[in-house]
């Protein structure tokens, strides 16, 4: 099962993430948990989140890039849900062997994230990648949808279909 942990503080403003979710929903075996819809008060149901994670084979952290990082509720979710003794540390093997895909949207162009004036995605992904490895997750190459503020509908739809294809390819490779 693919579990998408969706963290967008303003989902009604996002054309890119909306299209990505619409494409993902067309696949079988996909569950979407919209953190800002489930927890507008930031009071996370840790047991429910851990139960959802336990059913997943592939976990996707999907969100817009915010100041080269993740939205605050996703950070809190990671801090609370990926707890010692469950996700890491003594006895913390609940996520071992599962896969993690970072699916991120950006307002800037791809060249904005190349080495130079701004850090590249290899650098930006390091905290998430380190978290994944620490919890025994297999880190997959990230999916990034760039230029979401200026893309036309056709481009956004094409990139969303590419996202669906990434998920489908993972399903086929791991579940035949």
From Swiss-Prot:
Keywords: Cell inner membrane, Cell membrane, Flavoprotein, FMN, Membrane, NAD, Oxidoreductase
InterPro entries, A to Z: Flavodoxin_fold, Flavoprotein-like_sf, K_H_efflux_KefF, KefG/KefF
NCBIfam families found in the cross-reference section: PRK00871.1
GO CC annotation: plasma membrane
Protein name: Glutathione-regulated potassium-efflux system ancillary protein KefF
Main location: membrane
Protein purpose: Regulatory subunit of a potassium efflux system that confers protection against electrophiles. Required for full activity of KefC. Shows redox enzymatic activity, but this enzymatic activity is not required for activation of KefC.
Taxonomic lineage from the root: Bacteria, Pseudomonadati, Pseudomonadota, Gammaproteobacteria, Enterobacterales
Cofactor field: FMN
Pfam families membership: Flavodoxin_2 (PF02525)
Lipid bilayer topology: Peripheral membrane protein
Highest taxon, organism lineage: Bacteria
Organism whose genome encodes this protein: Shigella sonnei (strain Ss046)
